Amino acid sequence: MSTITITPISTFRTDDPYPFCPGCGHGPILDRLNEAMTRLDLDPANVVIVSDIGCSGLSDQYFTTSAFHGLHGRSITYATGIKLANPDLEVIVIMGDGGTGIGGAHLLSAARRNIGITVIVMNNLNFGMTGGQHSTTTPEGGVTSTTPHGNLEHPLDICATVGVNGAAYVYRGSSFDKDLADRFVAAMSTPGFALLDVWDLCTAYYVRSNKFTRAGMEESMRSWGMEPGLLYERNVTEYATGYRAAHASIAGSSVAGARPVPVDYAHTLARPMSLVVAG
């Protein structure tokens, strides 16, 4: 009998170079993600990377996994549906601080449900792709193209927000963390909602406007009351698992068929018509 030898995958990356600006932290973050997936010996066919809009939204095309690219701020909703439909998939969301703010309600719901997805927030404190506008994580006093005299809004603490709402694993760090791949491994190994708020430098805009540096970023975390490190780790029931257990008694049963729509009015149209609703 012949023996089949399976060679472990050495990388999940394609051969294409990243499109990010020189000094941008997005590339190192993706490299650490690639390292983590390789160490976990995942099957690319069972991994789905979900992204939306912005510089972070370019990420999924540089991996050999399945991917879903959708609307700004909605990546968590897509990921939730994918995980509920097939709980055996490893579902990873890559989003920016812009998408996090736009999809804030989705973020809260995913944390409350403790749905088993891993969310990586590439947090560079502004909307980098569209010209450096301020986002929900831009610090007070931060200079951006939309806050030229300094941001007046208090920044969103992403980790505290999901932490108090039930997330199973919450970590804050930066693209410079030596153990970032370890953190990704731990997050993806957590049977529940895991979020990593990974700060990085937007060298095109925020760095230039604020003279922001690596040392300044790490000091800012503490001075702004946003301590780095593992902030929450809980052993709670994952939503997709709990949902199936709660509905086990009706699993496989048929659902109601489509109901006919009664015709109340006749039409006088002689040809097909199209209607566009915009809003």
Where do the protein language model's features map onto the residues?
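Flexible, low-complexity linker and terminal segments
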Residues: 1-6, 10, 15-19, 199-279
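Short coil/turn connectors at secondary-structure junctions
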Residues: 16, 43-47, 86-91, 112-118, ...
